């Protein structure tokens, strides 16, 4: 007997093999073992893969489900007759009605390459046999749903177009008819509905929306003065010191009388402060008065006659001789 020698897998091949092996269902293997032995009457053995490797039991299985599917079953111990049995089984289950994506390849079983796919194929075959009416005591596989065709006449089809189910939706009732472009004005009434026009621009319906009432008419540039009253509304004007509780104003505050930055500031205002009655002591013969005028010597002489002699007294005689007293400069 010839055997294929296959070394261990490494790297990505080993990773893929381990991932496929992790999906293998041992409970499904036991159910398949019982189902195949019940249908064929043949024992698989302890090793599921080695018991099906020669393809003899598989050919007997499809012949039980569909008699005459495999006409010749090879019982040789050589590899090529065994591969031929597996190939005949694959062709037979395709003719039986199996989907191509549910069928395994010959190497998946013969070389133990992907026993998970072999298991998937046999479970699908059991479900297809159940669908065709082949029942056993082993409940395995899922029965395929049968096609149930319904035909309706034209009258029923047209009648259903006007019925909206509670669990269905429709887009026939809703449309964008009459919708205006974004940003344009919306009318408060529809001329087609023959409703009365609104009285003025300030009338807004409770169930409608409008942008007619709001505008930028009368809006001022940033920083300009705002009026407290509107002449169009025939309201009584108020003075500059009156500020409404619901309005704002900037008329009270101003820069009137403000001097240039860095200049001197007046301590008092002549309009509100009286002239001083007490004598003012000056530190010079001339100075600045309270009203901003200069004080002359005659004014100072009139205020202080005892101290003023017409001229300044010289404490030192004019013929005084200075001596160096031997100091060398």
From Swiss-Prot:
Q: Which GO terms describe its molecular function?
A: actin filament binding; calmodulin binding; microtubule binding
Coiled-coil regions listed: none
InterPro entries found in the cross-reference section: Calponin-like (IPR050606), Calponin/LIMCH1 (IPR001997), Calponin_repeat (IPR000557), CH_dom (IPR001715), CH_dom_sf (IPR036872), SM22_calponin (IPR003096)
Region (Disordered) residue spans: 280-329
In terms of Gene3D superfamilies, this protein maps to: Calponin-like domain
In this chain the Calponin-homology (CH) domain maps to 26-130
Q: Name one Pfam family in it.
A: Calponin
Write out the similarity annotation.
Belongs to the calponin family.
What the protein does comes down to: Thin filament-associated protein that is implicated in the regulation and modulation of smooth muscle contraction. It is capable of binding to actin, calmodulin and tropomyosin. The interaction of calponin with actin inhibits the actomyosin Mg-ATPase activity.
Q: Can you name this protein?
A: Calponin-3
Q: Which organism is it from?
A: Bos taurus (Bovine)
Specify the taxonomic lineage.
Eukaryota, Metazoa, Chordata, Craniata, Vertebrata
């Amino acid at each position: 007997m010839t055997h294929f020698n296959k070394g261990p897998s490494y790297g990505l091949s080993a990773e893929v093999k381990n991932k496929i092996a992790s999906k293998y269902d041992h409970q499904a293997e036991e159910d398949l073992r019982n189902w195949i032995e019940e249908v064929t009457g043949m024992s698989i053995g302890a090793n599921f893969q080695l018991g099906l490797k020669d393809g003899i039991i598989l050919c007997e299985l499809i012949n039980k489900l569909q008699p005459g599917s495999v006409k010749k079953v090879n019982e040789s111990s050589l590899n090529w007759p065994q591969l031929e049995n597996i190939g005949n089984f694959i062709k037979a289950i395709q003719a039986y009605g199996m989907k191509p994506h549910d069928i395994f390849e010959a190497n998946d079983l013969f070389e133990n390459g992907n026993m998970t796919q072999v298991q998937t194929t046999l479970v699908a075959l059991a479900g297809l046999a159940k669908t065709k009416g082949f029942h056993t005591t082993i409940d395995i596989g899922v029965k395929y749903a049968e096609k149930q065709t319904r035909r309706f006449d034209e009258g029923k089809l047209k009648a259903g177009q006007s019925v909206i189910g509670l669990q269905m939706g429709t887009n026939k009732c809703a449309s964008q008819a009459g919708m205006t472009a974004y940003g344009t004005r919306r009318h408060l009434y529809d001329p087609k509905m023959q409703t009365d026009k609104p009285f003025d621009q300030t009338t807004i319906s409770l169930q409608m929306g409008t942008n007619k009432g709001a505008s930028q008419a009368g809006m001022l540039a940033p920083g300009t003065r705002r009026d407290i009253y509107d002449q169009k509304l025939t309201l009584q004007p108020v003075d500059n010191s009156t500020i409404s509780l619901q309005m704002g104003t900037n008329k009270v505050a101003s820069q009137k009388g403000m001097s240039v930055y860095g200049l001197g500031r007046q301590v008092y205002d002549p309009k509100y402060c009286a002239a001083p009655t007490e004598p003012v002591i000056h530190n010079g013969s001339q100075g600045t008065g309270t009203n901003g005028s200069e004080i002359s010597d005659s004014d100072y002489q009139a205020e202080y006659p005892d101290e003023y002699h017409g001229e300044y007294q010289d404490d030192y005689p004019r013929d005084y001789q200075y001596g160096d007293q031997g100091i060398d400069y």
